[in-house]
Swiss-Prot record:
GO terms for biological process: translation. It comes from the Bacteria. One of its GO terms (molecular function) is structural constituent of ribosome. Belongs to the bacterial ribosomal protein bL28 family. The lineage of its organism: Bacteria, Bacillati, Bacillota, Clostridia, Lachnospirales. Keywords: Ribonucleoprotein, Ribosomal protein. Gene3D superfamilies: Ribosomal protein L28/L24. This is Large ribosomal subunit protein bL28. It comes from Lachnoclostridium phytofermentans (strain ATCC 700394 / DSM 18823 / ISDg) (Clostridium phytofermentans). GO terms for cellular component: ribonucleoprotein complex; ribosome.
Amino acid sequence: MAKCAICDKGAHFGKVVSHSRSQVSGRSNKMWKSNVKSVRIKVNGGTQKMYVCTSCLRDGKVERA
């Protein structure tokens, strides 16, 4: 799974609990994926292709090439 090169944001794991009437009938695994894009950014005067999350792109933490 891709991880943000700026803030190291990646996938999160947990459980999905299904409720049947008044008792818990089962738990299954779930993965929440971050909104990570492959973009060209400016690094040290050149361009480089990296995975960056959309929150870092929106906040202006990187400059697109």
